[in-house]
Amino acid sequence: MKLFFDHITGKLTNYDLIYSLALAEFEDNEYEYAFENGWIPLSWYYTKLKNLTWINARNTRLVLDKVEFSKKQKYVLRKKDIKVKILNSFDYDLLSTIYKKYIKYRNFYEEGFENDSEVFEKKDYIDWKYFIYYYKDTPVAFTEFKVFDNKHVLSGQFAWDYENPKLGLGTYATLYEKQ
């Protein structure tokens, strides 16, 4: 493991303020340690460093062998009109269309920069796979994920077009991806 810091800003003259990201590079055989200690990979620095960069960030770790579904959760997973496909690569137009609708519906944009906020940027060096969720044979949502080994899966962006909010696809996707 190699640790390094990106000192973004700070003011030490009158204040003791330092804003710095703690980053790391791990060897493949150190990934388990990284995940178990709150590190997650990101690709922001990849072009500069040429390696997968990890950040120590708040995240959720589940031991899937211990996840048990309630009757209500099992019922949610029996929705007959929802189908899921796994893709090894992404269709930019498909994901972009879903993402744009998601950003608009949820108001996840910065005022004055709406058009920029709605762009699904994929200058990403993590080789994501995709759960594509279909409602009545129409793609309506996706989740990106990366499998590291038989114990560690990283979940990335989720987006849903919200054309039918009563579908509860956020809940459905969360449950589906845990099974």
Set out the residue ranges of the language-model regions.
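Generic intrinsically disordered, low-complexity segments enriched for polar/acidic and small residues
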Residues: 1-2, 16, 96, 117
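Acyl-donor-binding surface of acyltransferase catalytic domains
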Residues: 2-83
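Short secondary-structure boundary micro-motifs
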Residues: 7-8, 16-17, 114-117, 174
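Generic detection of long, well-ordered alpha-helical segments
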Residues: 21-28, 88-96, 171
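Amphipathic alpha-helical segments that form well-ordered structural scaffolds
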Residues: 33, 98-101, 176
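A conserved beta-strand-loop-helix scaffold within acyl/acetyltransferase catalytic domains
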Residues: 39-45, 49, 68-70, 75-166
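Short, surface-exposed, charged/polar-biased interaction segments
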Residues: 51-55, 120, 176
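Conserved acetyl-CoA-binding loop-helix of GNAT-fold acetyltransferases
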Residues: 166-178
